[in-house]
């Protein structure tokens, strides 16, 4: 991409000397830049004044930067730093020399099935790592997938999409490109979970195999309608030679209902691998192995001079476009071992925007003279062996075992803890259970923030309504009388499938996290109470949160929710010295489920 008019090439931005414009989009610009203090080359994204001044955008982007900076996943480009300079937000990340997948597909057409699966497997690994840390990408598409000459794949732009496409899809010219990969629930008021990313990844798989996105339309309305109601296309019917088994993989990944999709991106990738013929499975494994062995993300630099083009001519699909730099070894000043540090906030700017248009080199490891090349080289060898082993394991891992049979409804009561088990956890000796509970609580409770009702109480009818659950069994335990010091409500809820149970917990986690730090007013039986939520701990399959009652002399409760097989475990433990009692009870119930 040439330096467009009004670019800031050649100027200084804080400590950065902006050397080359890499991309420009609706949110700002991306530059190759030299950090003049640290003496390394990075990619810097500069946000527009509009986004830099948006307080909601600023806070969400800071949070996403810290999370993305923590992700220890080789297929996520590390974020080094973020902040603002003279009121303009920026993001510093590793400079990666590569070509985005969209440009590869447009220039060379569809990929071979083994190569498509190898790339999808790597992106699935990045997504699963993000989802485990509570991050949704929300803009998975070929333009945000970067491919090196060795087919090492990176997923870029974590956090930016989630902060700008939640409720601000107003620029039609920019948004339509994203809408090609957007899950149906993104166009409605339904809850959006991590499975929207899985839908998008299935769309990308379809495009890798056929050369075109699943739905193409001249208008946004037609495109949205296709995602909501259109039949899911079959890759084998579009491009001869694609194994028919891919039709089922894409169909499940693009299921209209989130709960009908794969439970994880890795599950989708594994199913895609299984759809290949045996020779093609070996080919995909070779691609993965080669990409892992030839790429050293985050290793220390061993050369101060710009790299030269390899003497061996790479395949044409992997060649860099005219005007782009030659392929560079993945080297730079980041430590060769140990975790990538969480990015620090730079007092002086902000965040960058994704580049628009064609191929773009993205920040690979910064280049800097290293006085310890032997040490760095040794560390690089260790890392490449580890990554190679990971690639081999991913490609050649054994076929998945059959999932366990769903727990029968009549077995639910046996999963609950007995009185001695509850007393042991709560530090009491006289707690006794009441009558068994076999239906949801439909008491006329009013919560000022309705979405927080599930974070406050167990087995609530409004919370579970419409989720498809099939049965519930629960027990409430406390000391005798009205002046009890401990109170526990434990419930187990059966769903038709494990996927539906996991989807419910994921949805609950999203709602609980939105309640963190907030105070709600509860009206129950003509009485009013105020409860304040602490931060949510953990991520699905297990989440917990402590809520404290105002004016109750330290009375507080811990909510815990977990899932095992097709059973959701829903626990509330209350008392005056609450730590993680609900979490312990949930864990013990999960152990029982797993033994069924």
From Swiss-Prot:
Residues 16-276 form the Protein kinase domain. It is found in: Cell membrane. Pfam families: Pkinase (PF00069), PknH_C (PF14032). GO terms for molecular function: ATP binding; protein serine kinase activity; protein serine/threonine kinase activity. The chain crosses the membrane at residues 374-394. Residues 1-373 are cytoplasmic. Its main location: membrane. Autophosphorylated on threonine and serine residues. GO terms for biological process: regulation of primary metabolic process. Residues 292-368 are annotated as: Disordered. This is Serine/threonine-protein kinase PknH. It comes from Mycobacterium bovis (strain ATCC BAA-935 / AF2122/97). The gene is pknH.
């Amino acid at each position: 991409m040439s330096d467009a008019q009004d670019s800031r090439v050649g100027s200084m931005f804080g400590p950065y000397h902006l050397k080359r414009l890499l991309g420009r989009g609706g949110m700002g610009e991306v530059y190759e830049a030299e950090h003049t203090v640290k003496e390394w080359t990075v990619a810097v994204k500069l946000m527009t004044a509009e986004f830099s001044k948006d307080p909601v955008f600023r806070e969400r982007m800071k949070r996403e930067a810290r999370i993305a900076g923590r992700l220890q996943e080789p297929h996520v480009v590390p974020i080094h730093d973020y902040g603002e300079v003279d009121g303009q937000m920026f993001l510093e990340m590793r400079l990666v020399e590569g070509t985005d997948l969209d440009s590869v597909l447009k220039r060379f057409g569809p990929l071979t099935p083994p190569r498509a699966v190898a790339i999808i497997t790597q992106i699935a690994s990045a997504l699963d790592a993000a989802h485990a840390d509570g991050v949704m990408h929300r803009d998975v598409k070929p333009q945000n997938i970067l491919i090196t000459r060795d087919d090492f794949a990176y997923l870029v732009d974590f956090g930016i999409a989630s902060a700008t496409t939640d409720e601000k899809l107003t620029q039609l010219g920019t948004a339509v490109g994203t809408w090609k990969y957007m899950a149906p629930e993104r166009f409605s008021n339904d809850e959006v979970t991590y499975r929207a990313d899985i839908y998008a990844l299935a769309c990308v798989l379809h495009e890798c195999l056929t050369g075109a996105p699943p739905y193409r339309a001249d208008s946004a309305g037609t495109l949205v309608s296709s995602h909501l109601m259109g039949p899911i296309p079959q890759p084998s019917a579009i491009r001869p030679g694609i194994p028919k088994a891919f039709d089922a993989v894409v169909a499940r990944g693009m299921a209209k209902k989130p709960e009908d999709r794969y439970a994880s991106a890795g599950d989708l990738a594994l199913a895609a691998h299984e759809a290949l013929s045996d020779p093609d499975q070996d080919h995909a494994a070779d691609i993965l192995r080669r990409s892992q062995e030839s790429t050293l993300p985050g290793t220390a630099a061993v050369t101060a001079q710009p790299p030269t083009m390899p003497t061996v001519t790479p395949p044409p699909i992997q060649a860099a476009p005219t005007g782009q730099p030659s392929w560079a070894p993945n080297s730079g000043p980041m430590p060769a071992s140990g975790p990538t540090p969480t990015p620090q906030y730079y007092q002086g700017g902000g965040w960058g925007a994704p580049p628009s248009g064609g191929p773009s080199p993205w920040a690979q490891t910064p280049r800097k003279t290293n006085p310890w090349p032997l040490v760095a080289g040794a560390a690089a060898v260790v890392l490449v062996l580890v990554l190679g082993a990971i690639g081999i394991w991913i490609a050649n891992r054994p076929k998945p075992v059959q999932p366990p049979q769903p727990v029968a409804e009549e077995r639910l009561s046996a999963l609950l803890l007995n009185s001695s088990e509850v007393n042991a956890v709560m530090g009491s000796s006289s707690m006794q259970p009441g009558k068994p509970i076999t239906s949801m609580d439909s008491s006329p409770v009013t919560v000022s923030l309705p979405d927080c009702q599930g974070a406050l109480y167990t087995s609530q009818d409004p919370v579970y309504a419409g989720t498809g659950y099939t049965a519930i069994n629960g027990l409430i335990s406390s000391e005798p009388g009205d002046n009890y010091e401990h109170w526990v409500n434990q419930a187990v809820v059966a769903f038709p499938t494990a996927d539906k149970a996991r989807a419910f917990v994921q949805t609950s986690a999203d709602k609980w996290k939105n309640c963190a730090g907030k105070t709600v007013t509860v009206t129950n039986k003509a009485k009013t109470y105020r409860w304040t939520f602490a931060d949510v701990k953990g991520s699905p399959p297990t989440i917990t949160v402590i809520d404290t009652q105002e004016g109750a002399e330290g009375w507080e409760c811990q909510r815990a929710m977990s899932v095992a097989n097709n059973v959701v475990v829903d626990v509330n433990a209350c008392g005056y010295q609450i730590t993680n009692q609900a979490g312990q009870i949930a864990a013990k119930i999960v152990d029982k489920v797993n033994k069924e």
